[in-house]
Amino acid sequence: MPGRPSLAGRCLRGSRRTGGMGGGGSALRVCADHRGGINWLSLSPDGRRLLTGSEDGTARLWSTADGQCCALLQGHESYVTFCHLEDEAAFTCSADCTIRKWDVRTGQCLQVFRGHTSIVNRILVADNQLFSGSYDRTARAWSVDKGQVSQEFRGHRNCVLTLAYSAPWDLPGAPCAEEAGGLLVTGSTDGTARVWQVAGGGCWQTLRGHTGAVLCLVLDTPSHTAFTGSTDATIRAWDILSGEQLRVFREHQGPVICLELVNRHVYSGSADRTVKCWLADTGERVRTFAAHGHSVSALKYHAGTSKNAIPNYSYGSKGKQSPPLNWFPESTMVSKEREREQRPAQTGYLDDALRSYCRRSRK
């Protein structure tokens, strides 16, 4: 198995845990079928299945109802870096330089996407296209059905870590948006984000301003705005059509690892062990959630249910249960925390287990 330069996190144990926040908050079940750490997880649109990608080179499908493993997806020749789950298909990418599409009912591999020459870091599925970013410094667009490359995006001087896509119809008033076939935004360890025309592969804009690697990004397509998070501890807002930097969000004390945009609010998770909430339009910080014991590597806003019981998934470290960030009426912020690996550079994070919590909103 090749060495690991990936910025994606690793787990110390290949276990997935589910538990409740009531009482002592002990785990209700432990699913330890993986033989290596869990690098990523994806929840199906209907919430009934969970997909995990592991250091052991496999992905597994789980029932969220009982925690049972529904299918083993095996075929990759190295660790799985990222995974994405839809209703009928699962997608995984790996350090073996390939992407695979799977049948979620049978576990059968339906398609192998070959073309990248180094580790594939991220994938994104939209409009019957699959987009990928790799350590080979390229991003690529593929036909989901045929597994063939339809476009290559070259220009970054270092590896591509993060992706976001906007369809032409999501860009009202954007010049030549339809001819461009939509816009792909990529973030790289070269410190830039780039905006690409999907149809032609040309670079529309280069977003320069960060002084560290761009680790995460989200798009607000109605306003043509991209938000990027970096190892320089800042979040920056950009006009993706003009390339203009609109504002800088400064308060984090460590790399910004993950972003979520909800209802004109930007949520950010950082290596400084906090999640912060910002007003997207002004950059004003309106709230800080500082209950985490380790770096926050992923977060997800989840709307509440009629019973105010929200199932959440998070990573903890060293067997410690992840504490709740806070209580939200009718909603919650799901987060995943990681402990930084002891290395000279800020390149790796270690996780211990995946847990499921039920957090009830405060009246």
Language model: regions and residue ranges:
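Short loop/turn segments that connect beta-strands within beta-propeller blades
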Residues: 64-66, 104-107, 144-147, 198-201, ...
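Terminal intrinsically disordered, low-complexity extensions flanking WD-repeat/beta-propeller proteins
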Residues: 293-295, 302-363
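WD40/WD-repeat beta-propeller blade N-cap
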Residues: 31-38, 74-80, 114-120, 154-160, ...
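Conserved strand-to-loop turn within each blade of WD40 beta-propeller repeats
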Residues: 53-56, 93-96, 133-136, 187-190, ...
